[in-house]
């Protein structure tokens, strides 16, 4: 099965669903709303208010409430600017994109009562689902004015290439992501894959976004130059330990562990900046990295803290993990993961690093 068929957040509205476990993403989205508000204001300063409709896309939208916040913010800012400029009311067309396996049913069920259908709305809003990979083309040329994406662009199209020796041996044995014990070739392979995929993303958007159009991208990243620092490896490192314990119990085939590498990469600011500048289609209007404590760290009881952390981790890791190791082992795996997290959190409480990036499409 290809990554694009297995990469999605846990579905439904149960305890381990993404819809119920995306509070941190909501926090990040809320914190970065002033940046999105400023992006909308900038569009109006470039005469985008003369249009009949503003076309916006939320890429990698998943099925949590963050999308509702994004749409509401764009609508509110459009209404504010239309009143200030005394211009005709624009309509808002929003495209919600994610891979076909995404839980669009839960997304649109929540959307209908929160964003659309308001009889008193100043800016009419029309929402369309667009299943597909954002690493390729999704929209017609010069059709988008604003693109938003939160916690999606760091996912890769595939596990990095070149992680097997000429003799067929796994080069990242016993690990599922970059680790302190990983050889340099593993780090190089991950960066190379991110470079390739992010470049594809930029190339596709460069054709779809109108000149002077804007993109607001938020992704997991790191402040350190070392990709094996715990700020970016914590969850994957502990999951690898949990999987290895099940291997030792004969519940998982060791070869499945040795040949699995997570299709995700948390880049540094310098790496992101370098790729954008090399691409040459967009200017960087704003870029910063910031750290936040995981919300589970506010819990005093270590078991409650560990269980909540594991539940959130399961929401975004289970689909890709179960695709490799089997659905039948998931409850046991995440139970083991919870125990490991509880013992590890007493010594390490890593902050979560995010990168926010505002890009403008170059004219000409």
From Swiss-Prot:
Its EC number is 2.1.1.-. The keyword NADP does not apply. One of its GO terms (molecular function) is methyltransferase activity. The keyword Magnesium applies. S-adenosyl-L-homocysteine binds at residues 18, 61, 98-99, 133-134. Mg(2+) binds at residues 172, 258, 260-261. GO terms for biological process: methylation. The record marks 148, 220, 264, 312, 327 as: Involved in substrate discrimination. Pfam families: Methyltransf_7. Gene3D superfamilies: Methyltransferase, alpha-helical capping domain, Vaccinia Virus protein VP39. Keywords: Magnesium, Metal-binding, Methyltransferase, Transferase. Its cofactor is Mg(2+). InterPro entries: MeTrfase_7, MeTrfase_capping, SAM-dependent_MTases_sf. Binds 1 Mg(2+) ion per subunit. It comes from the Eukaryota. Belongs to the methyltransferase superfamily. Type-7 methyltransferase family. No detectable N-methyltransferase activity. This is Probable methyltransferase ICS2. The lineage of its organism: Eukaryota, Viridiplantae, Streptophyta, Embryophyta, Tracheophyta.
């Amino acid at each position: 099965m290809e990554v694009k068929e297995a990469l999605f957040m846990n579905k439904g509205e149960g305890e381990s669903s993404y819809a119920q476990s995306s509070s941190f993403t909501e926090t990040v989205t809320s914190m970065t709303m002033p940046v999105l508000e400023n992006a909308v204001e900038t569009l109006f300063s470039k005469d985008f208010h003369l249009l009949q409709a503003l076309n916006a896309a939320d890429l990698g939208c998943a099925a949590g409430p963050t999308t509702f916040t994004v749409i509401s913010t764009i609508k509110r800012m459009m209404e504010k600017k239309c009143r200030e400029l005394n211009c005709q009311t624009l309509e808002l067309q929003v495209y919600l994109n994610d891979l076909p396996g995404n839980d669009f049913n839960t997304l649109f069920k929540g959307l209908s009562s929160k964003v659309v259908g308001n009889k008193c709305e100043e800016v009419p809003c029309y929402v369309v689902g667009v299943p597909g990979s954002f690493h390729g083309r999704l929209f017609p040329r010069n059709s988008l004015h604003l693109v938003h994406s939160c916690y999606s662009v760091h996912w890769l199209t595939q596990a990095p290439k070149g992680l097997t020796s000429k003799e067929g041996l796994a080069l990242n044995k016993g690990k599922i992501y970059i680790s302190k014990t990983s050889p340099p070739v593993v780090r190089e392979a991950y960066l190379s894959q991110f470079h390739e995929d992010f470049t594809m993303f930029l190339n596709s958007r460069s054709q779809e976004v109108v000149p002077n159009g804007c993109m607001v991208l938020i992704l997991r990243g790191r402040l350190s130059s070392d990709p094996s620092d715990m700020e970016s490896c914590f969850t994957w490192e502990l999951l690898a330990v949990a999987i290895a314990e099940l291997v030792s119990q004969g519940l998982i085939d060791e070869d499945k562990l040795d040949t699995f590498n997570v299709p995700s990469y948390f880049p540094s600011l310098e790496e992101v900046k370098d790729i954008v500048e090399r691409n040459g289609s967009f200017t960087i209007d704003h870029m910063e990295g910031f750290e936040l404590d995981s919300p589970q760290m506010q819990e005093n009881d270590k078991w409650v803290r560990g269980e909540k952390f594991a539940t959130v981790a399961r929401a975004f890791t289970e689909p890709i993990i179960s695709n490799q190791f089997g659905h039948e082992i998931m409850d046991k795996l995440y139970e083991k993961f919870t125990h490991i997290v509880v013992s590890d959190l007493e010594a390490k409480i890593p902050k979560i690093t995010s990168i926010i990036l505002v890009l403008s499409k170059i004219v000409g």
